[in-house]
Amino acid sequence: MYRKDSIIIEEWLKRSDKALLVTGARQIGKTWLIREEIAKSGYRKFEVNFIDQPDLVDYLNVKMSANEFLVKLKMIMPEDCKPQETVVFFDEIQKCPEIVTKIKFLVEEGSFKYVMSGSLLGVELKGITSVPVGYLTVLRMYPMDFEEFMIANNVSKTTLEMLKAKFETCQPVDEFIHQKLLWLFFIYLIVGGMPDAVKIYIATKDIREVDKVQRDIVALYKEDFSQYESEDKKLKLISIYDIIPAELNKQNKKFVFTMLNKELKFDRYENSFLWLKDAGVALPVYNVEAPVVPLKASKSSNVFRLFSNDTGLLTSAYPAETKLELINKNSEVNNGAHFENAVAQQLTANGLEPYFCKKKNIGELDVLVEMDGKVVPIEVKSGKAYKAHKSLDNFMKISDCHIEKAYVLSVANMEQEGSVVYLPIYMCYLLKERKIGKLIVDLDMEGL
């Protein structure tokens, strides 16, 4: 299946003289993609998986010089793994984090190219004291976004190019195509972007089979909670993770700590929230006090909404009736939790950091992001009244905010009224920062 990150790995294999670290949550396709790109590149691959080969953890994860490490590594490599022709792939690196500290030497020595991958790296690498800055490229992967899901479901390149053109010119999509893509988006809300779930959907079209895959993935996540943390912290992590669907289903989607424990104070659970974020299984979207650049400067670390890393995993936690309503595109039902989770997931995958903003006497903005140096508000509407956005109108009138353009995502077709663009929800994947090519600054200093 097509993954956008394949281009990054392909470019790294061709040109980079650094090591590559691919991180992200479990089951998002990291290992598969690395193997695919190495196979296409013509390089020989030597792979070490520290879960499947636990004896190699003791062999390589001990205190030794970088030179000793390289000697030991070469001793377990086949003879046909020749220098300059081989990529060494360390998988499940969270089990052997000491290797990260050796990367600077290994890169400088130059015999092989090195790629590392694993889950929970945001958690496990926090204890590493010597991360090789300047010698390591980090690629953060996410579940498949809606564009990748469309490609997996045989949406043509011509259609994708048409959507991009319509987005750039604010022109409506042909109604027949619009309805087809809207239906596919509702399917995406159920299936999500976990590659195994997408594969089983494409093969069977059976949502029940998809649900089995999703429940297995959730079970793996909870197994990780147990494997890497104490019993007390494991229970906190499971409690927080399990309550995400209920919290998002409320009208006020802000995470309320007393839902976990009436006596709870945020600082008792703060590390658990951060653990879920660092592990890549949850996406916190923080409140900001001021909708101005930089948004991060006014974020409230204890006021946030907590989303699932994958809309399909979120939907799997709801009753079967919820899936039927989504399949039927029932706009009378409140699908706000699913829509907002999908938007948070997509914006994050696009490299943006979503926030929300709630201010007295003005209202609440669903999403705020920074794009091209400007604050862009985004309203997410799952019902028919998508043009009713009083809070957005209030924010647009505040001169201090300097808001030039806003988006309303809904099931409606594309149109623009003033500075508000009404965007079909399936076009969310097109909201990203513009790519800047070469920026050459050539100053003539002669004569100074």
Spans of features found by a protein language model:
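Pre-Walker A adenine-sensing motif
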Residues: 1-14
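Conserved lysine of the Walker
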Residues: 30
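Hydrophobic positions on the alpha1 helix immediately C-terminal to the Walker A/P-loop
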Residues: 33, 37
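Short glycine-rich substrate-engagement loop in P-loop NTPases that contacts/grips substrate
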Residues: 52-83
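Structural recognition of the conserved hydrophobic beta-strand(s) that form the central parallel beta-sheet
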Residues: 113-119, 140
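Interdomain motor-coupling "hinge/lid" segment immediately C-terminal to the ATP-binding subdomain
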Residues: 126-249
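Accessory nucleic acid-recognition modules appended to NTPase machines
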Residues: 194, 199-365, 369-372
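Domain-level recognition of nuclease-like catalytic cores that cleave nucleotide substrates
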Residues: 412-448
